[in-house]
Regions:
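Membrane-interface helix termini and inter-helical loops of multi-pass transporters
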Residues: 30-43
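Membrane-interfacial loop-to-transmembrane alpha-helix junctions, especially the N-terminal start
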Residues: 76-85
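Transmembrane alpha-helical segments in integral membrane proteins
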Residues: 60-72
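Alpha-helical transmembrane segments of multipass membrane proteins
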Residues: 15-23, 62, 91, 95
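N-terminal signal-anchor transmembrane alpha helix
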Residues: 3-26
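Membrane-interface loop-to-helix entry segments
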Residues: 46-61, 103-115
Length: 132
């Protein structure tokens, strides 16, 4: 049983980390590229080196939350929670592609709005499953 829990934890952790790594791989040249460097950014924009550790931490926390949901829900409740999580992860992935790779700022904004709605939906769904 413990090995099954460890495997579930590892899989839940790896899913968002792989998605994040893949989007980072696709957009790696764009983040330091001319297009992004020429954008007008606010004074509080953090330096580029901050993003890798912050996103790694966020994707790790997403994986932990997926594991908590996986272990504490069953049936239709689990199915809906994993669907919302997957939708959020897809929107997260798409934002990097839309903004950095394709330079589609307006579509990136639309994606972020959908992502925030999905995150709120996810918080509501996950809160009903487990209050840590």
């Amino acid at each position: 049983m413990k090995n099954k829990k460890n495997l579930s934890f590892l899989i839940c952790l790896l899913i968002p980390l792989i998605v994040g790594s893949f989007s980072g791989f696709i957009t790696r040249y764009e983040v330091d590229g001319t297009w992004f460097n020429l954008l007008k950014k606010p004074s509080f924009n953090p330096p580029n080196w901050v993003f890798a550790p912050v996103w790694t931490t966020l994707y790790t926390l997403m994986g932990i939350s997926l594991y908590i949901i996986w272990m504490n829900s069953f049936g239709e409740i689990r199915k809906k929670a994993v669907f919302v999580f997957s939708l959020q992860l897809l929107l997260n992935f798409l934002w990097s592609i839309l903004f950095f790779y394709s330079h589609l700022i307006l579509y990136g904004l639309f994606d972020i709005i959908l992502l925030w709605i999905c995150i709120c939906w996810m918080i509501i769904k996950f809160t009903g499953i487990n209050l840590i």
